[in-house]
Amino acid sequence: MAATKRAACLIGWPAAHSRSPLIHHYWLRRLGIEGGYSIEAVPPEGFAEFVLHLKTHGYVGANVTIPHKERALQLTEPDERARAVGAANTLYYDGDLLRSTNTDIEGFIGNLDASAPGWDRSPHAVVLGAGGSSRAVVFGLLERGVQRIALANRSIERAQALRDLFGERVVPIAWSDIPAALPGAGLLVNTTSLGMKGQPPLQIDLSALPADAVVSDLVYVPLETDLLAAAKARGLRTADGLGMLLHQAVRGFDLWFGARPHVTAELRALVEADLAPK
């Protein structure tokens, strides 16, 4: 049960290792807002009842994480972004109506804007992976005006499904065709789990990328993946997964607490310290 002050929560199963409370409590302190942010471990069989009585639990809104993102879409009034991505990660009230959105799109684009200003000057991008994170990335790139997205996935059918969803600017390619797609691409994005701690590395020759290209990796454990290290070694600009995690939290905080926070170096250092091996 949340306190009577304005409060939000993260709903997941499991959710104990989330950094969301650290992020939101930092902003509450910095902005002098009386509020709270809790973790609610809710199993799938109890999710619908919990969400439908969110106000009764004392919350003005919530973040939603695995495995509830798709179900949250069905239980709320989703916006265009949540519908396009097929998942909701942020719930908020509009009067008594519970609405939902997906802030991964803003998180991805906001991180690029902060880490690599001018990244969108190139009309071409290459995106690796066709899962849920890829949907958010593709939506954001198209909305920003990218004209051609080469979408590589080991299962070409999943990439074709995203082309069917988002239109002809998305061009499905085989995984083996990635090297041929890199020349002229101003942005390379990894949305897969390759390179994550405990997963195989993502091994791609970046030599064909233009000298002013940007490389983004949604993985944030480790903070510097092999892909980002290779990009930096070539003098390319990079955007890591932690930046996206921080930027995606901004809109939810604004919706719940009525103030738009900033992603600062101090906040990043705080979360980096929490991520460091103990």
From Swiss-Prot:
Q: Does the keyword Repeat apply?
A: no
Q: In which pathway does it act?
A: Metabolic intermediate biosynthesis; chorismate biosynthesis; chorismate from D-erythrose 4-phosphate and phosphoenolpyruvate: step 4/7
Q: What's its catalytic activity?
A: shikimate + NADP(+) = 3-dehydroshikimate + NADPH + H(+)
Q: Name one GO biological process term.
A: amino acid biosynthetic process
Which residues hold NADP(+)? E80, G129, A130, G131, G132, S133, L218, G241
Q: Which GO terms describe its molecular function?
A: NADP binding; shikimate 3-dehydrogenase (NADP+) activity
Q: What keywords tag this UniProt record?
A: Amino-acid biosynthesis, Aromatic amino acid biosynthesis, NADP, Oxidoreductase
Give yes or no: UniProt keyword NADP. Answer: yes
Q: Where does the source fall among the domains of life?
A: Bacteria
For binding shikimate, which residues are annotated in this chain's numbering?
A: S18, R19, S20, T65, N89, D104, Y220
Q: Which residues form the active site?
A: K69
GO cellular component terms, alphabetically, are: cytosol
What's a Pfam family in this record?
Shikimate_DH
The record's function comment reads: Involved in the biosynthesis of the chorismate, which leads to the biosynthesis of aromatic amino acids. Catalyzes the reversible NADPH linked reduction of 3-dehydroshikimate (DHSA) to yield shikimate (SA).
**HAMAP family noted in UniProt:** Shikimate_DH_AroE (MF_00222)
Q: Which family does it belong to?
A: Belongs to the shikimate dehydrogenase family.
Q: What is this protein called?
A: Shikimate dehydrogenase (NADP(+))
Natural source organism: Rhodopseudomonas palustris (strain TIE-1)
Q: What is the lineage of its organism?
A: Bacteria, Pseudomonadati, Pseudomonadota, Alphaproteobacteria, Hyphomicrobiales
What gene is it encoded by?
aroE
